Amino acid sequence: ANSAAKFHLYPHVEARYKLASDVLMIHAQVSGGMQKNTYKAMTKENPFTGDFVLPGNTNNKLDISGGLNIKLDKEILFSAGASFMRLKDAVYFVNDSTGALNYTTFSTIYSDADVITLKGELVFERNEKFNTHIGATYTNNKPDGLAKAWFVPAVEINLGGYILLREKIIFKTDM
């Protein structure tokens, strides 16, 4: 048995409230959890991860989030949200300068971090046969002991949608 093993207890509280029937809804959540950082998960996130990485766990000590959904009309929905996470031992990728092929692979380091995320999305949906959406996410990731969160995008923009062509034929895209 590992004498360093610790027991963790995490909150999970969620609240939703409709302010104006189906037009405006607000929501909030407080949670946390433990995330396994396996070699398989790290190479899926970054295929250039080197062979000598240390698997570990990221302790999401606290995750507070909230937002609102506004139905602008019967076919258009706008949603916005914000979150704050306090992470212990979050995994970050850095250039591996020790290998034979310097700077062509990445190694991992673990650092505590505070992460603030702001996001918004606009959705257009017509009678369950056509849907399109555009959204943006801004992330302020502040790891301890690192100049910045390397290889973690600060801004992400997504665009996508689907069309139901026939009963069992769906065309779907996400970028």
Feature map (PLM): residue ranges:
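Exposed, low-structure sequence patches enriched in small/polar residues
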Residues: K6-Y10, E14-M175
